[in-house]
Amino acid sequence: MKPLTILAGFAAALVLALPASAADKAKEQAEIQKAARESLDKFYKKKPAIEGEVKAAPGYAIFRTYGLSFVVGGSGGGGLARDPQARKDTYMKMAQASAGLQAGAGEKDLLVIFKSKAAYDNFVQKGWEFGGAGSVSAGVAGKTAGGGSGQQEISDATTYTLTRNGLDVGGALQGTKFWKDKDLN
């Protein structure tokens, strides 16, 4: 009788935990949606032409990342990829590793605007990995300065990075990976 009691208790705990898990999932999705709206507004304010690019694109992705570096660095974050025609969001994660002459900590927003539906679909279905880009940037409180305009061209996509409250200085080789968030989709 004791194993049956233990099994019943485990089943009851599992059933009670499921609604909380669904509520947590919905809460996290809502937080990502809010962060995405805030980030887009900041990109639009910084460079108004981006709004037209986003509206004309077959898809885009927006991420908020947090990182720390001193010679070796890393950052990670989450966000979403949006298909505006299907009105569908796919929740995604991002991780970045770097090595080189660098020091800093901060929060950044990353916007990827896809030039083709195929590039967007490939990003969502297979993720993305790329690396080898040098970076030199400095920014405080949402302002970017340094090596370039904060815009970078990748095959069939344009990316924009907005430094929110951090300072990154150096020439670092970075590898970045994007993938679907299996818990939020």
Report residues per predicted region.
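Bacterial N-terminal signal peptides that target proteins for export
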Residues: 1-10
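Sec/Tat signal peptide C-region and signal peptidase I cleavage site
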Residues: 16-23
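Small-residue-enriched, tightly packed secondary-structure blocks
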Residues: 23-185
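Hydrophobic core
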Residues: 10-16
